[in-house]
Amino acid sequence: MLKIYNSLTRQKEEFRPLEPRRVRMYVCGMTVYDYCHLGHARVMVVFDMVARYLRHLGLKVTYVRNVTDIDDKIIRRAVENGETIGALTARFIEAMHEDERALGVLPPDHEPRATESIDDILAMIGTLIERGHAYVGSNGDVFYAVASFPNYGRLSGKNLDELRAGERIEVDEAKRDPLDFVLWKSAKPGEPFWASPWGPGRPGWHIECSAMSTRCLGAHFDIHGGGMDLQFPHHENEIAQSEGATGEHFVNYWMHNGFVRINEEKMSKSLGNFFTVREILARYRPEVVRFFILNSHYRSPLNYSDENLDEAAAALSRLYTALRGLAPDLPLPLGEDRDEGFSSRFADAMQDDFNTPEAIAVLFDLAREINRHKAAEPAKAAALGATLKSLGNVLGLLQTDPEAYFKSDAGGSGLSDADIETRIRARLEARKAKNWAESDRIRDELKAQGIILEDSAAGTTWRRE
């Protein structure tokens, strides 16, 4: 039975979907005013893994991940760039899709945009006003009345009195309560706006997700995910809005992935340790980055460093090395087990709150077993190799042909395959002539350019670092 850590109850719970064999899941997506950074990549990869595994279990998953395409940051960036908001957001939405494709992230079933959901947003705000959960402030903005929702703070564990007393609360005289948050912002000169019963304006960030999730998945659904940084106030506000508007319990399981750290420090533009996905992909293969993300438990901090990425690259190469040179479709001897319990161990790990590090450890045990059988029992090795590829596929890994993986250029050597093969032949001639110095020179020259030679009884193979 799959168990998920529920941020709402702060414990692991057996996952029981609202409808048998069907799962509805919503994840907060990007605010598209810049390129994806590693934090965005983690959200994309983590919840792609969740959706893949639920589908692997035979469940019908409806996965919704929104796009915030109107926001204060978007407006500021468009002004700075001297371009329209539409041009800015279109460019970064396309860049986001390129990055997620590179990382092996399957597209969500629905990707609603805030600007395409204005009618739903207006309807929800109207309902909240009717039910006494929202009001029009003295400045024309519409605010959510936090005091009207007794369960506010349940997700984050925040104490309302302490929040009110906190020095960080910005005092806004238009509000009845310092904790009240904006649902509809009245129009300001030079900013985009839409007509509403409360005057022209645009939606606040929090109401967008409530409106889009309930439209796509209904008032009550199974899983809501996002980064830990969104737990408060964003997800807390979503609960207040959605339950205030519908009168129903909003979400059964709340999932939050951990923070990204750079060299043991919090990732931050102000600290100068901020990396976009594109900057990382210029140095590392996309599959290495995906492997790196999944090799930490989704709730744990993810510590980015060159050393950790290099270790991920070496580890992934070991898995591909196990798959290299396997004979396809060899029949196993009668009664021979082609799995040896690896699939069961993998499932046990994944059923325990998507424990991908433990699941990946099973893949390495499987790879060692393949290597042990390669020479003496090729049929056994091939069968185990099929299991390794199948389990890797559940995580979106190990789907490239091993030879193609090792020979693809990951941004290192400029040598062509033909150049490399020519030098390997020259090295072979040197070895035949017992010219070991020349043989070593060619090997070292290739290594300096990121080409690793591997000698065996079957001959010499090569791979790019």
Swiss-Prot record:
It catalyses: tRNA(Cys) + L-cysteine + ATP = L-cysteinyl-tRNA(Cys) + AMP + diphosphate. Its EC number is 6.1.1.16. It comes from the Bacteria. The keyword ATP-binding applies. It is an enzyme of class 6 (ligase). Keywords: Aminoacyl-tRNA synthetase, ATP-binding, Cytoplasm, Ligase, Metal-binding, Nucleotide-binding, Protein biosynthesis, Zinc. It is found in: Cytoplasm. A motif ('HIGH' region) lies at residues 30-40. InterPro entries: Cys-tRNA-ligase (IPR015803), Cys-tRNA-synt_Ia_DALR (IPR015273), Cys-tRNA/MSH_ligase (IPR024909), CysS_C (IPR056411), Rossmann-like_a/b/a_fold (IPR014729), tRNA-synt_1_cat_dom (IPR032678), tRNAsynth_Ia_anticodon-bd (IPR009080). Zn(2+) binds at C28, C209, H234, E238. Gene3D superfamilies: Cysteine-tRNA ligase, C-terminal anti-codon recognition domain (1.20.120.1910), HUPs (3.40.50.620). Binds 1 zinc ion per subunit. One of its GO terms (cellular component) is cytosol. ATP binds at K269. GO terms for biological process: cysteinyl-tRNA aminoacylation. Belongs to the class-I aminoacyl-tRNA synthetase family. Monomer. NCBIfam families: cysS. This is Cysteine--tRNA ligase. It comes from Methylococcus capsulatus (strain ATCC 33009 / NCIMB 11132 / Bath). The gene is cysS.
